[in-house]
Amino acid sequence: MESTFSSPAEAALQREAGVPGQFTPPEDLDRVYELERVTKFVCDLGCQRVTLQFPDQLLGDAGAVAARLEEVTGAKMFILGDTAYGSCCVDVLGAEQAGAQALVHFGPACLSPPASQLPITFVLGQRPVALELCAKAFEAQNPDPTAPVVLLSEPACAHALEPLAMLLLPKYQDLLISRPALPLPVGSPSSQPESLERFGRCFPLNPGRRLEEYGAFYVGASQASSDSSLDPDLSRLLLGWTPGRPFFSCCPDTGQTQDQGAKAGRLRARRLYLIERARDARVVGLLAGTLGVARHREALAHLRKLTEAAGKRSYVLAVGKPTPAKLANFPEMDVFVLLACPLGALAPQPSGGFFRPVLTPCELEAACNPAWPPPGLAPHLTHYAELLPGSPFHVPLPPPESELWDTPDVSLISGELRPPPPWKSSDDTRCSALIPRPQLELAESSPAASFLSSRNWQGLEPRLGQTPVKEAVRGRRGIAIAYEDEGSS
């Protein structure tokens, strides 16, 4: 049955996916999905049940890949699709429900450490790269052969960085090649323990060198990309890269380059705006945006502690993948904070936008921790794990008696003076023998009461004695989808 408020039950079965599936010719499956390496991974572990996780755009090949792997390995394959939050994260919960002994992740990945010790391997794909065109573009944007530059790429172009570096190394000596921070096979020792791991990549820095000294040349961005559809992986790099250092992107198909400095400036300016909105907020909604990334529970407890120390009220919301329609059900929230992987937190927002700003945990940290950033260090972080104890960027909250809590602060949005946290403005009981008791004109300031008083409609009015008495009449019968007095359609 169909009505104004509901769709027929058959609509869910007839609905087509919004992303067209990819269908690879059978003779190219082994090359595109690296089935030889995946087969070795499964056979070395002796797995009998393996889950294959595909993003929406690769689900068209999922059946053929699973059938090929079952035929070669003899193991039972389970296909995972339509993940609850983001396909870039490993769906360890889905793998555990299937009783899998290993997981193979296909497509773009954030490479965040999973919350489970399940053996995992990644197949990032191999996008074609015009090496000669990219090498000429690099030389055009970097005329100084002594300037330090690091080669970056989107995950699908990582295979081309080594060949590209071979074309450039005779001329450029201070060239650093990044590689994806893939998990090592179980039981294998680390071959490069000195590598710096950041942004889901490993940087083999020489002793005494720092990543902040390098410019960047990114292979993977398209010339037609705009700010509204900026790839979240590129956004993560632009936010975290050292301000003032050159950052160029190169289209792997055409070799056209683009200076990303202006986009990086706009991203940082928006981050400063969101930090101001978080400082003005009194009620914060913490969105659980991942359950499969390591330390997500510890991060959630850290964010609740942050908001409490700043005198804000927080609520934890588990709504799955956030959409404007879902978040519109919580008008009491001033801002939302999405606890997700770096790519999920920086994913492009829907065209309509959210009615309240959606922040990352790093922006909430900057808004609520008066000791942030640490002296001499102003990193633009993108992953919540970098805020937790054990990270070099972790900054503990100052003690209650610290003067940092009393620093005057003026909102750059409203122009009003922000009050200190409520616990800071309470009476000092250390020497209160001769302090007169206040008049208590305002007993308590509640964010919930302030929000209720600002609403146009505050509920049904009693209007006692003003409503005429009437005899009770029979109401409507049935359920909301089809009352008895409504004709069936």
UniProtKB/Swiss-Prot annotation:
Indicate where the modification Phosphoserine is found in the sequence: S7, S446, S488
Keywords assigned by UniProt, alphabetized: Acetylation, Iron, Iron-sulfur, Metal-binding, Phosphoprotein
Task: Name the cofactor(s).
Answer: [4Fe-4S] cluster
Q: Which residues carry this modification: Phosphothreonine?
A: T467
Which InterPro entries would you find in this protein's record? DHP2 (IPR010014), DPH1/DPH2 (IPR016435), DPH1/DPH2_1 (IPR042263), DPH1/DPH2_3 (IPR042265)
Residues bound to [4Fe-4S] cluster: C89, C110, C341
Q: Which GO terms describe its cellular component?
A: 2-(3-amino-3-carboxypropyl)histidine synthase complex; protein-containing complex
Q: Does the keyword Oxidoreductase apply?
A: no
Cofactor binding description? Binds 1 [4Fe-4S] cluster per subunit. The cluster facilitates the reduction of the catalytic iron-sulfur cluster in the DPH1 subunit.
Q: Where is the signal peptide?
A: none
Q: Could you mention a single GO BP entry for this protein?
A: protein histidyl modification to diphthamide
Pathway participation: Protein modification; peptidyl-diphthamide biosynthesis
Q: Which residues carry this modification: N-acetylmethionine?
A: M1
What GO annotations for molecular function exist for this entry? 2-(3-amino-3-carboxypropyl)histidine synthase activity; 4 iron, 4 sulfur cluster binding; metal ion binding
Tell me the function of this protein.
Required for the first step of diphthamide biosynthesis, a post-translational modification of histidine which occurs in elongation factor 2. DPH1 and DPH2 transfer a 3-amino-3-carboxypropyl (ACP) group from S-adenosyl-L-methionine (SAM) to a histidine residue, the reaction is assisted by a reduction system comprising DPH3 and a NADH-dependent reductase. Facilitates the reduction of the catalytic iron-sulfur cluster found in the DPH1 subunit.
Report quaternary structure and partners: Component of the 2-(3-amino-3-carboxypropyl)histidine synthase complex composed of DPH1, DPH2, DPH3 and a NADH-dependent reductase. Interacts with DPH1.
What family, per the record?
Belongs to the DPH1/DPH2 family. DPH2 subfamily.
- This protein is called 2-(3-amino-3-carboxypropyl)histidine synthase subunit 2
